[in-house]
Amino acid sequence: MTIWFLIGFLLPVAIFAAPPPINRLALFPDKSAWCEAKNITQIVGHSGCESKSIQNRACLGQCFSYSVPNTFPQSTESLVHCDSCMPIDSVWDVVTLECPGNEEFPRVDKLVEKILQCSCQACGKELSQEGAMFNVYLNTAEDSPAESLGHHQHRPPAREDDSPAQSHREGESEE
């Protein structure tokens, strides 16, 4: 039974797992890959709203990629490798922007990825933004991410003269 588990589950995982990052190449032994999180000031904005400056980090570095010419018929597996400097640890924060003059949506919440740590990772390994937003919404018990892809808009408190249909549409967003 254990052998079937190893063959059926672990073998495909091992085959399709991304290769580890490469730190040095034989052709350039004096060069090494590097990737680090650099402090930046990020401007968060939204149409019709006041922008906000926040402190964040950006991933910056030089990671190795290479492609060795192929042969036909192919005698060995393709020799292509790609690493990119990208986040390995981040959190998502809500940044609230004020939107003066917009009575319907006086504030807009933007989800902003705050990068904590970076490293050379296999290209195409980016974490899905929708998946990350889904986790944020699950953790904060707010509206679902499908209702506001990328930001959540706040309406002002309902006035007494508002009809129930108007205040019920709070989760709808206008793009």
Swiss-Prot record:
One Pfam family it belongs to: DAN
Signal peptide positions (record): 1-17
Biological process terms in GO annotation: animal organ morphogenesis; determination of dorsal identity; sequestering of BMP from receptor via BMP binding
Region described as Disordered: 144-175
Assembly, per entry: Interacts with bmp2; the interaction is blocked in presence of nog.
Cellular component annotations (GO), alphabetically ordered: extracellular space
Subcellular location: Secreted
Compositionally skewed regions (Basic and acidic residues) per UniProt: 157-175
Keywords: Cytokine, Disulfide bond, Secreted, Signal, Tumor suppressor
Record's keyword annotation contains Disulfide bond: yes
PANTHER family: GREMLIN 1 (PTHR15283), NEUROBLASTOMA SUPPRESSOR OF TUMORIGENICITY 1 (PTHR15283:SF5)
CTCK domain: residues covered: 35-124
Species assigned in the record: Xenopus laevis
Bridged cysteine pairs (disulfide): 35-85, 49-99, 59-118, 63-120, 82-123
Main function: May act as a tumor suppressor. Cytokine that has an axial patterning activity. Acts like bone morpho-genetic protein (BMP) antagonist in embryonic explants. Blocks the bmp2 activity.
Organism placement in taxonomy: Eukaryota, Metazoa, Chordata, Craniata, Vertebrata
Domain of life: Eukaryota
Gene Ontology molecular functions: BMP binding; cytokine activity; receptor ligand activity
Protein name: Neuroblastoma suppressor of tumorigenicity 1
Family to which the UniProt record says this protein belongs: Belongs to the DAN family.
